[in-house]
């Protein structure tokens, strides 16, 4: 077995970025990451988690995922888009999330952009979907960004989205399964054998 795959406490082989002691990351890896979805709230959640991960670690973000879900109304785009300055002030004091005002404001602005953007985020995600014949053989094969992610980020910025650089957009693409970067040998990889 490759060093890019670890065996979890449950005996399942996973991508090595999931530490065996991090149940929040393992749950996200097993149930969400790399699973193709075009559901509006799932797309908004992935986009939001990427905004908050910028400059931090995914472990911190995964540990606060339930807090984000509560703070941002279950990632209901209309409700988040209707949030006010008072709501933002309240969230800056909420210890269940990452209390970064710029990222909270970006999340509200991104919800507003999602409500008005054409083409929609789902349509854009579909247009950038990657079909691979084989899974990456190692973590080293997984890029931080791609030309497709750069183009996708540029389109999102033109629609008013914030905190959407090529690296965070590539992470978004991974999160929603537009690209499946589960490493060969992981039980979620497309070609496990």
What are the roles of these predicted feature ranges?
Residues 1-193:
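HhH-family (HhH-GPD) DNA N-glycosylase catalytic core used in base-excision repair
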